[in-house]
Amino acid sequence: MKNTVLAAVLVLGFNSASHSQSTPLTEYSATYEASANGLAATGTRSLTKTGANSYELSNSLVASLVGQSLAQMNQLSAFELVDDQILPQNYSYTLTGVSRASHAISFNWDAALATSSEDDESWQIPLHSGVIDELSYQTAIRKALIADTDIGSTLSFEIIDGDEIEIHEYRRAGNEVLSTPIGDLTTVKLEQVRDASDERVTEIWLATDWNFLLVRMEQLNNSGLRIELELKSAVLGGVEIEAND
């Protein structure tokens, strides 16, 4: 639904009466540098614990040209961790600058309904177990990899996008050592699964020694535009990420 360069760059279960203990998520903050057809951008991402089982995942990106800020994108996902599963509560996306767009989702798990609004439109979407938003699914990927690091299986997620629920699938394609501004980092590479006729490509690399934090992302869209995002620095659980020994 998001057709801007910024969105291309950056772009689980019902509550119950009793809950088992969930494994806490590790807080982190990270900065990224990005590029797309000569357009430079800087990004920040952080995961913050806001309550006993509550978290906020934030993502921002500022694009500039010749030192002038052109646009800013902000994403925020507030979710709870229930029975070790991600339960989204609210999601927001805003784009300001040369282009403007907004998207918000409110999850009502008691009523099994989500209210999704995009610019001037709004929709009611029935909820079922496993549905998440366009930002918290990235935490779901990391949790899945932490639980099971066998290479070769496919990860599947149901994500609200505008007025519908889409299925996103990622295939684990092996491990790679990447050279980054931090130094060499060992990563697992994921490829988004698409139809054979779809020319779009999405590849992401996650640090195996650092809770599968996002290290790099590359996207190629139908028009041939290539977008790249790379980790510049990060602190995970109070520890600064370092290169391989």
Place the predicted regions along the sequence by residue.
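Hydrophobic, well-structured mid-protein blocks that either form specific transmembrane helices
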Residues: R100-I146
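Acidic, serine/threonine-rich low-complexity disordered tracts
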Residues: Q21-W109, A147-D245
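Short, exposed beta-strand "edge-strand" segments with a Pro/Gly-rich flavor and a Y/T-containing core
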Residues: F14, Q124-V131, G162-E164, E199-R200
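Sec/Tat signal peptide C-region and signal peptidase I cleavage site
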Residues: S16-S20
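Positively charged n-region of N-terminal signal peptides that target proteins for export
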Residues: M1-T4
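Bacterial N-terminal signal peptides
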Residues: A7-G13
